[in-house]
């Protein structure tokens, strides 16, 4: 019989969160970003849940796009990193994938065979991928000369600081983008990551790209998902496998990093960093059992962690402990571990089964 440690995926929560994104997008359409195996939730099941809600998905690479096709969905699929080799363009054309082209090498691959419809990435200040605004006239002229401009769908950029409500950079990037693409009003525009949906008066143009918000985690500094009207889609659970009383003066776990100041009832939970639970989540990190919040004690081990059961004396072996979900948000755990909810959700390992409900 398998270990009961599990990630439960609430498909209704996914749908709720997408509808929230669509509501915030206003007149823009919303493409569902399902990269990184649907942010750890299972790309095929996420695509199944959201297919009736959207006409476009977005992924990082062609393997993820192929997984969506393998699930039977014929939606347009945007490849946010474009293609990594020339031969992939023919597959994009055959399968209806839309690569985001961001460099001269990718442009040079066009026209060598079957060319797909594509987006063009504009670097407005994040300086990861994309053409600088002053390079766009030459890019577009080259496409016109090669007879490929008709395959261009639109322009894309990505915000560096949209999660920070006090930052002025998003407004600056928006203005740079608008000026850069103004000569081609017939092409569509896409700028809005999850955080951009929550910025008042932020233009989202024709297509927004909600990602982390679809899974119920917060994209905004200082705001919880619940405060933003989102529902957690993943509940990570593991069983209590033993309980004991640690006597005053005794310590728990590797490094003896926590010592009891008084007799304390504790339990061991069958989950650890080999399952994707963050090793740096130390004493005080919240969890929950029987609907009540508890706290971690000491260091997280590879396959186990310890919790303080003082607040829930009725807790017993076999009870399921929520590591994150509806009682304890993934963002709370991430803060305690010095990271972000994105990393935790995408980091749940393959030995934790996903149960879609």
UniProtKB/Swiss-Prot annotation:
Q: Which positions bind substrate?
A: 128, 302
Q: Which PROSITE patterns match?
A: ALANINE_RACEMASE
User: Mind naming one GO cellular-component term on file for this protein?
Assistant: cytosol
Checking InterPro entries in the record gives: Ala_racemase, Ala_racemase/Decarboxylase_C, Ala_racemase_C, Ala_racemase_N, Ala_racemase_pyridoxalP-BS, PLP-binding_barrel
Q: Which residues carry this modification: N6-(pyridoxal phosphate)lysine?
A: 35
Annotated pathway, please? Amino-acid biosynthesis; D-alanine biosynthesis; D-alanine from L-alanine: step 1/1
Q: Which GO terms describe its biological process?
A: D-alanine biosynthetic process
Q: Is Isomerase one of the keywords? A: yes
Q: Which cofactor does this sequence's record say it needs?
A: pyridoxal 5'-phosphate
Keywords, alphabetical: Isomerase, Pyridoxal phosphate
Q: Which Pfam families match?
A: Ala_racemase_C, Ala_racemase_N
State a single Gene Ontology molecular function: alanine racemase activity
- The enzyme class is isomerase
Q: What does this protein do?
A: Catalyzes the interconversion of L-alanine and D-alanine. May also act on other amino acids.
Q: What is this protein called?
A: Alanine racemase
Q: Which organism is it from?
A: Marinobacter nauticus (strain ATCC 700491 / DSM 11845 / VT8)
């Amino acid at each position: 019989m398998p270990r009961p440690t599990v990630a439960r995926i609430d498909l209704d929560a996914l749908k709720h969160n997408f509808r929230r994104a669509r509501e915030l997008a206003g007149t823009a359409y919303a493409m569902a970003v399902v990269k990184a195996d649907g942010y750890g939730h299972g790309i095929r099941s996420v695509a199944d849940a959201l297919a009736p809600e959207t006409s476009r998905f977005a992924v990082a690479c062609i393997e993820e796009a192929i997984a969506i096709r393998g699930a039977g969905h014929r939606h347009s699929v945007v490849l946010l990193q474009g293609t990594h080799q020339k031969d992939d363009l023919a597959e994009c054309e055959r399968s209806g994938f839309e690569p985001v082209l961001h460099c001269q090498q990718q442009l040079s691959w066009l026209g060598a065979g079957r060319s797909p419809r594509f987006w063009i990435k504009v670097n407005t200040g994040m300086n990861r991928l994309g053409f600088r605004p002053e390079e766009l006239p030459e890019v577009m002229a080259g496409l016109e000369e090669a007879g490929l401009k008709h395959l261009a769908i639109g322009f894309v950029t990505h915000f560096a600081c949209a999660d920070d409500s006090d930052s002025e950079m998003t407004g600056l990037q928006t203005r740079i983008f608008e000026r850069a693409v103004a000569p081609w009003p017939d092409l569509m525009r896409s700028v809005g990551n999850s955080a951009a949906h929550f910025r008042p008066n932020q233009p989202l143009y024709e297509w927004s790209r909600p990602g982390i918000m679809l899974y119920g985690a917060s994209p905004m500094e200082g705001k919880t998902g619940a405060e933003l009207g989102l529902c957690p889609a993943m509940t990570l659970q593991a069983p209590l496998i033993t309980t004991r009383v640690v006597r005053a003066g005794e310590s728990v776990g590797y490094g003896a990093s926590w010592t009891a100041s008084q007799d304390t009832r504790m339990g061991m939970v069958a989950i650890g960093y080999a399952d994707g639970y963050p090793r740096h989540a130390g004493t005080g990190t919240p969890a929950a059992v029987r609907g009540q919040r508890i706290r971690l004690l000491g260091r997280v081990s590879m396959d186990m962690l310890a919790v303080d059961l003082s607040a829930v004396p009725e807790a017993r072996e076999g009870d399921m402990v929520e590591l994150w979900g509806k009682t304890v948000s993934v963002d709370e755990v991430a803060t305690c571990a010095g990271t972000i909810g994105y990393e935790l959700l995408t980091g749940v390992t393959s030995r934790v089964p996903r149960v879609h409900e």
